[in-house]
Swiss-Prot record:
Lineage: Bacteria, Bacillati, Bacillota, Clostridia, Eubacteriales
Outcome following mutation: D187N: Large decrease in substrate affinity and activity
Gene: nanA
SMART domains, per the entry: DHDPS
Subunit relationships: Homotetramer.
Source organism (scientific name): Clostridium perfringens (strain 13 / Type A)
The protein, known as: N-acetylneuraminate lyase
GO cellular component term of the entry, any: cytosol
Functional pH dependence: Optimum pH is 7.6.
Length: 288
């Protein structure tokens, strides 16, 4: 399960419907061009929290059909609706996903006992492995190392997608849980996270920048910090340009420039303007 995973983008048509042909093209691009080790399906990058249960299921089906046996597949099934999370956990386990993942329950200020109940309910409903999806800056849920330890007492909870800039907590967790998987979740911080011993990374920009992500990861693991830092500098220049132009819209526009039918974003995300399209063309030419 270690390595470089793209947080899978989803192609939508102008009316917000899933563009199945485009989604398959994105998956193929990730596998054939970006050379990723796996796909993290149904996360923030997939605009998951704006989708119906049936739409989520269809995306899980397409990803499995297109990528089965070629790369590892992790299904993000988390939801504030626990019944939906359990339903999706069962659905993706039956499809054959290598692991499931679940974002910490958000919006309502759940206490830790409620969060623990949420995870135990999901993982105890299936014969599978679970990776916690920790992204405090969006969920408002900041778990302590003691709370992670309590969750990790369940052997079926095998790791965490750590999308935070708290490198002290990351170091403490790596030391405390040597047998648990830790995936870095911030693409722009991949080098320091790798130095601290993460087992891999899950990133949105890997949909276009997966090759550089692997270069950073492998160079840092070998102790070649100079090379890793050089590639991280280029990567962060790219990320800065993407963020300044609109994250998901720009990644999709870059893919369009590379011949992939990446489609539109789901409303209420805005449609790319002519200025955004022109800038994305410049970004693609500059970095790829």
């Amino acid at each position: 399960m270690k390595g470089i995973y793209s947080a899978l983008l989803v192609s939508f048509d102008k009316d917000g419907n899933i563009n199945e042909k485009g989604l398959r093209e994105i998956i193929r691009h990730n596998i054939d061009v970006c050379k990723i080790d796996g796909l993290y399906v149904g996360g923030s990058t997939g605009e998951n929290f704006m989708l119906s249960t049936d739409e989520k299921k269809r995306i899980f089906e397409i990803a499995m059909d297109e990528a089965k046996g070629q790369v590892k597949l992790i299904a993000q099934v988390g939801s504030v609706n626990l019944k939906e999370a359990v339903e999706l956990a069962k659905f993706t386990t039956d499809l054959g996903y290598d692991a499931i993942s679940a974002v910490t329950p958000f919006y309502y200020k759940f206490d830790f006992n409620e969060i623990k109940h949420y995870y135990e309910t999901i993982i105890n409903s299936v014969d599978n492995k679970l990776i916690i999806y920790s992204i405090p800056f969006l969920t408002g849920v900041n778990m302590s190392i003691e709370q992670f330890a309590e969750l990790f007492e369940n052997d079926k909870i095998i790791g965490v997608k750590f999308t935070a800039a708290d490198f002290y907590l990351l170091e403490r967790m790596r030391k405390a849980f040597p047998d648990k998987l830790i995936f870095a979740g911030f693409d722009e911080m991949m080098l320091p996270a790798t130095v601290l011993g993460v087992d891999g990374a899950i990133g949105s920009t890997f949909n276009v920048n997966g090759v550089r992500a692997r270069q950073i990861f492998e160079a840092a693991q070998k102790g070649d910090i100079e090379t890793a830092l050089e590639v991280q500098h280029v990567t962060n220049d790219l990320i800065t340009d993407i963020l300044n132009n609109g994250l998901y819209q720009t990644i999709k526009l870059i893919l369009q420039e590379q011949g992939v039918d990446a489609g539109y974003c789901r409303q209420p995300m805005k449609e790319a303007t002519e200025e955004m399209i022109a800038k994305a063309k410049e970004i693609n030419k500059k970095y790829f």
